[in-house]
Regions:
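Non-catalytic interaction/Regulatory regions outside core domains
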Residues: 1-10, 19, 23, 30-40, ...
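Active-site-adjacent helix/loop patches that line small-molecule binding or acyl-intermediate pockets
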Residues: 2-20, 24-26, 79-199
Length: 321
């Protein structure tokens, strides 16, 4: 069923979400990465990107924060572009682990594959697959170019975050070499880990992430730049991955309460994809116990529920002037 709203009405809903959530004091910044612990906890922004390229944004949507695990979506798309859907399914997989995002146990339980590129093990594996094999500099260029194409503008590496991540990524070092033990990493493990750490340290804005989400929702065509970033056949594949594991072991609850596939990161960002309709992103540093932004979750849930939209319903938003 079509749900018609004016652009002004949609802006009002986004503003309402911001106003309703802004004063929430729940959660706390990630404290196991020193840089993230020191980000201003009061920062908060919401951005929506429509498929015609129009954006609606409220709050701190131009602040660059650490993309963290939201970058897993971007590199999964790059791997899908370079290898195709079947090879990624065979070499990495698309299943949720039901365990925390940085789980080593998940590798031990399912050592024939890494489950999904949207948890740490699968993301490190995906970084190892990025072409050209064996060339760290060119791999990095491909990763950054892909993020730029999806977001419509370039990210910026946050050097302090990269150092902070590199100094504390002991668990991920174990993951990389355990993957090597099971032949589930496809380039040098240390190189793959460094690429993964760097991509998580890219600085992006909520506005940029909403455009990236809009690109997925638009079947691979960036709504703002109009560039075809990836083939339309891959959009349902990456959206399925996000829907299955975007909030890790809490994805079921998220889908039940929000109705939108979304990926979260410990930098405070959440990026949601409503296929054929829009992309949405929100950012606020304080996280819940599972590492998901408290305010960003509430804001996106408010917008979805207020508009009566759900990826599993036949409601379709039409924005009119």
């Amino acid at each position: 069923m079509d749900k018609k709203v004016t652009l002004a009405q949609l802006k009002e809903v986004v503003q309402e979400a911001y106003d309703q959530v802004k004063t929430n004091t729940g959660g706390k910044n990630a404290d196991y990465i020193p840089y993230l612990a020191n980000v201003n906890k009061d920062l908060f922004g919401i951005s929506v990107c429509l498929l015609n390229g129009q954006t609606i944004h409220v709050g701190d949507t131009d602040y660059r924060f650490g993309i963290e695990s939201v970058s897993k979506v971007h590199t999964a798309i790059l791997a899908l572009r370079q290898y195709g859907a079947k090879e990624i399914l065979d070499k990495i997989g698309a299943d949720a682990t039901g365990l925390p995002f940085n789980s080593i146990i998940a590798i031990l339980l399912e050592n024939d594959h890494t489950s999904t590129p949207l948890v740490n093990a699968g993301a490190i594996s995906a970084c190892s697959m990025v072409k050209p094999i064996g060339d760290s500099a060119k791999k990095w260029d491909a990763i950054v170019e892909n993020v730029t194409d999806l977001c419509g503008s370039a990210p910026q590496l946050i050097d302090e975050l990269y150092k902070s991540e590199s100094d504390t990524n002991f668990n991920n070092r174990s993951i990389a070499w355990l993957l090597k033990n099971y032949n589930r990493i496809y380039d040098d493990p240390d190189m793959a880990l460094d690429l993964y750490t760097r991509q998580c340290s890219l600085g992006v804005t909520a506005l940029q992430l909403s455009v990236a989400a809009g690109t997925i929702a638009n079947g691979g065509v960036n709504p703002v730049t109009k560039k075809e970033v990836f083939d339309a056949s891959l959009a349902p594949k990456i959206t399925a991955m996000i829907a299955a594991v975007g909030f890790y072991e809490h994805t079921g609850d998220w889908m039940y309460t929000s109705g939108i596939p979304a990926k979260t990161g410990v930098g405070g960002g959440v990026m949601g994809v409503l296929p054929g309709q829009f992309g949405i992103a929100a950012f606020a540093p304080p996280l819940d116990g599972a590492g998901n932004s408290v305010k960003a979750q509430l804001a996106i849930q408010y917008v979805m529920n207020k508009l009566g939209l759900n990826v599993f319903s036949d409601n379709h938003l039409i924005v009119v002037d």
